[in-house]
Amino acid sequence: GSKIKPDSSGAWNNLIFPLQAMKLQTPEIEELLSRINPKASSMHVQIAKSVLRFSLYQGGKNAENALNEVCNLLSKTDNRSIKNLEVTKKESPPQIIGPDNTVALVHFGRSGTGLLHSLIDDHTEVSTLPSIYLSEYFDHSTWERIISGGWSKMADRFMAIYDVLFDATSTVPVQTKSNRLISNIGRKEGMANVGDQRDEVLSVDKTLFSAELQRLMNCYDQLDAFIFFKLIHRAYDKAINDTTQKNLIFYHIHNPDTHAQLNFVRSTPNANWVMMVREPVQSCESWLGKAFEQNNYTEISNKISDMLF
């Protein structure tokens, strides 16, 4: 048999399609999974196999059990939280938005999530970040990068990873599914030509954001990815001079990697989910139109296969 790197998320994602196809002939999912025996047995490998199991059970009667198994494993991982070794407790923790008041938006193939997001993002009681930059924020590798320099560097590392959040013309790539990178996403998402004349660039003052984020962080003796996520929203609102009280976080998670999505579910199991759908033929036409014009059969077939499985 062929060998794969057991810690490669891309390799694990690539197993989903053939196993979904094989499932049509071999319905016993555990039998299919028994053929995958990576030599490494690290927690990361255990989680990757558990995520794969969930993907195969999704939509079936055992999906909930598979989900609980993944969330249980994710809750045992190292580095889920980071301690503030210089905690001063000068201020009490701010009234941050509760986990129950979070809405996550996912798409189903060119269904108009960007339009819905744009209609919601100016609501005075809603805190939201622009575009889909943070779709992979809850992937374990993102949090590891943010905390890798210690507590004092978290704000700087976040701003470096998501530079496009502060300047839509930034060429710094952001992570997408299977650890792939998208460059110039701000321009591609239309954030570099906003305003009435479409000649303005969406930008945010990093100095203001950083100062507010660090002030909020210093109220805590430790942080995990979800609390930090909420503080990011508070700091962003302050940086754009939005001081109104927020009651809800609207998270355009869009099309996350399964691992990132399940880690978000574990972090806030009571979040509300919205999946946006569109008239199927129109959705397909919008989704495949460019590849069809270019006569790119491979891209068309790959997109349809991804959607079906």
Predicted feature residues:
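Glycine-rich phosphate-binding P-loop
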Residues: 105-120
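Structural marker of alpha-solenoid helical repeat scaffolds
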Residues: 4, 36-39, 73
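Structural signature of tandem alpha-helical TPR/SEL1-like repeats
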Residues: 22-34, 61-65
